[in-house]
Amino acid sequence: MEDAPERTPSSSESTQPPGLAREPEVVSPGDSEGCARPLDTVPKKLCGYLSKFGGKGPIKGWKCRWFFYDERKCHLYYSRTAQDANPLDSIDLSSAVFDCKADAEEEGTFEIKTPSRVITLKAATKQAMLYWLQQLQMKRWEFHNSPPALPATPAAALAENGPTLHLKLEQEEAELEEFLCPVKTPTGLVGAAAALQPVPAVPSALQNISLKHLGTEIQNTMHNIRGNKQAQAAAHGPLVEDSPQGGEPQSGEQPSISDPSLPEKEPEDPAKSAPRSSVPSGPTQKPKRQSNTFPFFSDGLARSRTAQEKVAALEQQVLMLTKELKSQKELVIILHKALEAAQQEKRASSAYLAATEDRDRLELVRHKVRQIAELNQRVEALEQGRERLAHEAGLREQQVQALQQHVQLLMDKNHAKQQVICKLTQKLTEDLAQPADATNGDFLSQQERMEHLKDDMEAYRTQNRFLNSEIHQVTKIWRKVAEKEKALLTKCAYLQARNCQVESKYLAGLRRLQEAAGAEAGDFPELLQQLIQEALQWEAGEADSVGLSPVSEYDDYGFLTVPDYEMEDLKLLAKIQALEVRSHHLLAHEAVERPLRDRWATLTELTPSAELKQLLRAGVPREHRPRVWRWLVHRRVRHLQAPGCYQELLARGRACEHPAARQIELDLNRTFPTNKHFTCPTSSFPDKLRRVLLAFSWQNPTIGYCQGLNRLAAIALLVLEDEESAFWCLVAIVETILPAEYYSKTLTASQVDQRVLQDLLSEKLPRLTAHLGQHRVDLSLITFNWFLVVFADSLISDILLRVWDAFLYEGTKVVFRYALAIFKYNEEAILQLQDSLEIYQYLRFFTKTICDSRKLMSIAFNDMNPFPMKQLRQLRAAHRERLEAELRELELLKVEYLQRRASLGRAPPEGCVSEDEGEGDS
């Protein structure tokens, strides 16, 4: 039975198989060294007979099938004969890979592997197999390289990228041709001419019938029985190529010999046509063996030994005479030096005796003494030189000994090699003395084995080249599919962003219509209310049905993306804000977020620099944020960290209950009620937060615990996920970044920062400050909590964590920058409000309406410049001095009040009954 079909085509699809293939006329695959370029010929259909392995049980075996290719679908159809009207089945080549085995049992066997099955085919010859594999590869590549039917693209982009894409495709095709040389078309086995050939014989007719597709077999048989000769000719029609004139045969099928445009047929190599196992006959090789000189080696060596001994004796005699001559020369030199010394002594004595006066004789003696002194110095210098030379001679002697040992080793090796040579020579002499017939037999068997090995090597080489080309082409196809997928994902993200924008505008329009309609009579307000309810209740399943990802309920850190407000108008506003946030995120993902992620990925080692400062202001990607925060915290608390410090604080908390433990327990349930990590009963975050806050209470007894610290620690836990790291992050914020007394009982530093913010707001945003002052709006009621928890309750999580990225590196100046930027972002909306109650109501949630994090960052770090730290310190010092004076004045008033109360006493006024007196007392 046949394998399970991938897809059974209809009869209408199979009547006209459109597969066309290029037929390159080049050398055969055996000539791998010189691959000729393919010639441009008339396109021909890819079709022909192949054997397909299939079936089950006793009828399992090879079945002859007619295969033809369909270019429109990239499918390879097959039927029992070329005259069948309906194909039996098809093979999807778009996702298939091809393989050929060099060690296959039968020559010409190859495989087509699809995701659902493996089809084993067999061609008539090895050349036909390679031709089919190359053509199938080419057809698959042409199918994947065909321009996809994508949605409309801007004409300018197509005009700009057109030449580049065409050049890229040409380069890829040129690369594919470098692996396996194009194979010549097998004559009579492939193409339309193969349909005219008789069907290859099979062992039995029953074995060739496909029981899996019995219905198709019956249809084809009935079609052939009902047909006449004219119908049979019509059945042959689609398989024969159309000729230029009616009755003339196609010249491209059988090229004429006189046509100069086609290559002449190369004569067959007689060496290749002969059997590879054929070898020269025995008698022709005997004279070569008899002409060898190996049997005369022993006589030549015997005659050469006497001459070598004579030469050695003569060389020894010459060496002795040379040594004797050298000694005679040394003796002559010594006698010559002694003669010169005697003559010099004689001349000195004659000069001494010839002197007439004692003065001259004394001068001669002095001269000789000086000469003796000089000679002594020279003797000492020569002695030193001699010692140095003796030392060098010792070193040279050691080197000579080492070289002698090396020479001895080489001589031993040489002696061993000579022994091996002698043994081999003796063995060779014995082998030459053996009969020639046995030698010829061994030689012929070895040569035959060598021919078989050459055949195997050539087969494996061909297989290797084909597999290399297959891997290369599959990789190219995968890369092209990945590029298409990336382009489609980018376009999908853009369409999602546009959809979010349109939906947010739609909801904003509904909200404006609702506000404008008011309480008018009629069905118009009810219709608006129904539309708003439908927009708010639009489920994610409906978004999936149209292929768009909906707005997720929670973000990456567990915060609600759509805040849960009780009022209907605020619910609609929250939905609009969530859509705008997603729209900004999708639009900025490719243009801004991807380059930023790439820059962070290359930043392996963190060091303080201007580049790191800019990257932190732009925001840290989620996958890098824990690592970056740990590094920022460690820079600030490394002088406070000690091994085991956190565990000691936890042990102290278990041993003794802290006074702030009750307040911490109450605030745990109030920490981020919209975050799933702190509201889920099975979450471990509340327990971690409790331990972090208790450890900090023991770490800093001056502060202990203050409301607001729970939110700081919770943000650190959500990002770092490790409670000890979150503890040190809380320590870094409270003890190293924020000013002292920020969380004291009087919150002195916090109040100072509120006054500083008021001064900066009047300087940077004078119109807004005047407008708020006109309506007597106290901004500290809104902004005090911003500074106390660093915007933890105010901004959406994406913008909040970007603020914290820069805050942990630069300090509190970032908080002032973003506070001013928030008012600048919403300045026009606040100026339009003309009632203090409306302003307070808007300021209560206006920070949640900020969606564009890039715009807010640009305002904070560009529009708010200049923002020197020196000015911030001066303002803090001035306001702190005023605040401390006010606190001292309040303290004095409190003391005066207590003293006045103490002086007046606690006696009740006359006529008043004391609580201690009963009703029945007189």
Swiss-Prot record:
One of its GO terms (biological process) is positive regulation of GTPase activity. The modification Phosphoserine is found at S914. Residues 619-811 form the Rab-GAP TBC domain. Keywords: Cell junction, Coiled coil, Cytoplasm, Cytoplasmic vesicle, GTPase activation, Phosphoprotein. One of its GO terms (cellular component) is cytosol. Disulfide bonds: none annotated. The keyword Zinc does not apply. Residues 298-435 are annotated as: Interaction with RAC1. It holds the Pfam family PH. Residues 1-168 are annotated as: Interaction with CADH1. Interacts with activated RAC1 and CDH1. Residues 1-37, 228-297 are annotated as: Disordered. Acts as a GTPase-activating protein for RAB7A. Signal effector acting as a linker between RAC1 and RAB7A, leading to RAB7A inactivation and subsequent inhibition of cadherin degradation and reduced cell-cell adhesion. Residues 8-17, 275-295 have a biased composition (Polar residues). Residues 262-271 have a biased composition (Basic and acidic residues). One of its GO terms (molecular function) is cadherin binding. This is TBC1 domain family member 2A. SUPFAM superfamilies: PH domain-like, Ypt/Rab-GAP domain of gyp1p. Residues 302-333, 362-417, 443-476, 869-904 form a coiled coil. Residues 43-141 form the PH domain.
